[in-house]
Amino acid sequence: MSQRESLEVRMDDRLVGTLALTANHKVAFSYSEEWLEHGFSVSPFSLPLKNEVFVPKKDYFDGLFGVFADSLPDAWGQLLLERLLKERGKKEAQYSVLDRLAIVGKSGMGALTYHPQKEIGMGQQMDDLDELSVHCQKILSTQYSEKLDELYRLGGTSGGARPKIMTEIDGENWIIKFPAHVDKKDVGKMEYDYSLCAKACGIVMSETRLFSSDICPGYFGTKRFDRRIEKNEIKRAHMLTAAALLELDFNQPSLDYHELMKLTKILTRDCTEDVENMYRRMCFNVFAHNRDDHSKNFTYIYNEKDDMWRLSPAYDLTYSNTYYGEHTITVDGNGKNPGKKELVAVGVQAGMKKTYCERVAEEIRLCVNEKLEHYLK
């Protein structure tokens, strides 16, 4: 099959610009004239609003700028696509990165859409969460699942490693997660308990729920923050992960919370609420043993009306380890065993008072120890 060499990028049916495959397999981008006149920079540090052709300098986003790589699915979605293509006698290697963005089309996270989109099958509606979970396990264990089309339709363009679906509940958009094959059965209950604790610690999160199950303690669900209802219409929000903003490979430890705090201050124009919330997240991740705190787990949302970037609600807060036994993002240079000393140092350097940093860190430590003790033993 011939691979696609260019693709339109749109937002709310407005042409943002064009992606084009170069001879050295990088994907160049240029803004449309309309967007240059009425739009905004979709990636402030990498793609300023200028009339020029931008070419990525790094290779680890498959030749894309980070903002467009954010639209591609992570491990679970990639696995589903690979299985779906194999079932149809095709190989993923036959598809360029632009082909994969075309498959994402209008179904990706955030506000960017890709055209012309490529349909690869829709499947039939499945409403039973336990049934979906069982089929997810079949996929993870390399077994055949007759519901592959439906699993891809529901979760093939999502981020993250764990199986999940994106679905509508009472007119609102939700993400519901299922256990991976290495997870304990209570992984959904644990993430739900973590979300309640995080909220008690003053961390901003979307609404969360524990969906009932007959085969496990429940499935964790969270309302999507990249979708909102406005005048009876679903509006999409443009967003960027820290990995995309800084053009970083999130699989490699390459960031310190000092830099994440600085990024938050610069991007949000020193919004006190967001800077303090980032500090709380850092404290929570340390005390609640969330070591998989990589740069795709921090996101910023753009408000076009106010021309403002804001820190998104927190997500993926749960007990986690890394294969190297440390936090993915170091705390004042310490990834192995950071404590209050390092946390306060990060907060103070970000411009917060030492007494405030000490008080917040201690409050979060006590709250975590009280509410999550059974997970941390």
Residue ranges and their predicted role:
Residues 1-295, 299-377:
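Phosphate/dinucleotide-binding and metal-coordinating scaffold of catalytic cores
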